[in-house]
């Protein structure tokens, strides 16, 4: 039997501050060694949990695990078959591949070791939580990389109302500023480690311009 706790919050905090909503969900964790922030409109394939435990039995050293994803629409039709990750992917290569459009990433496809997540400072916050998932995965996976679980996928729903799918002028402006903040944070992060950012200044500028346009 599964020990499941349902929690109804008195306010819709995620509407105004998604990171704050994630934080209070994380605060509910008790003795769980791992967690996944899974959305109520996305879908796990039936064998996802089974394949995670199989992966864990043989590859228990990692702090970040990952499911490959496909994108679905509101009718559960697959609209995009996303490229699969290498089974072991370094944190820097993760960033490089995302921002050169070779892989996709969404928060519900990642499983984190709870103790390590807390030790690394939890979520990296940007406006609208935009780019926060990428930054958070980078920090958590810096030491050991990301281990991808085979033979099971997460189906991430692009409903047309997700932040990443919203195109009104106000939201686009906030997303552009969040992207600039993220790239500034990224440069500072690698500078603090005496390492070179996986994205050049030219690449970061082009990506920012793309976000604005």
Name these PLM-found stretches.
Residues 10-30:
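Glycine-rich, basic loop-to-helix element that forms the pyrophosphate-binding segment
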């Amino acid at each position: 039997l599964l020990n499941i706790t349902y929690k109804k919050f008195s306010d819709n905090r995620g509407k105004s501050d998604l990171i704050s909503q994630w934080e209070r969900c994380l605060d509910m964790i008790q003795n769980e060694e791992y967690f996944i922030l899974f959305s109520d409109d996305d879908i796990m394939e039936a064998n996802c949990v089974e394949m995670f435990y199989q992966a864990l039995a043989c590859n228990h050293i990692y702090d970040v695990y990952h499911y490959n994803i496909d994108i679905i629409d509101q009718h559960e039709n697959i609209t995009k078959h996303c490229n699969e990750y290498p089974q072991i992917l370094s944190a820097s290569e993760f960033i490089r591949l995302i921002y050169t459009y070779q892989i996709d990433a969404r928060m519900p496809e990642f499983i984190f070791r709870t103790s390590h997540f807390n030790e690394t400072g939890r979520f990296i916050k940007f406006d609208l939580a935009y780019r926060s998932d990428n930054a958070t995965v980078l920090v958590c996976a810096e030491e050991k990389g990301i281990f991808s679980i085979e033979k099971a996928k997460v189906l991430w729903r692009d409903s047309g109302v997700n932040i990443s799918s919203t195109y009104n002028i106000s939201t686009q402006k906030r997303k552009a500023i969040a992207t600039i903040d993220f790239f500034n944070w990224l440069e500072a992060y690698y500078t603090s480690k005496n390492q070179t950012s996986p994205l050049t200044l030219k690449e970061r500028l082009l990506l920012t311009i793309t976000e604005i346009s």
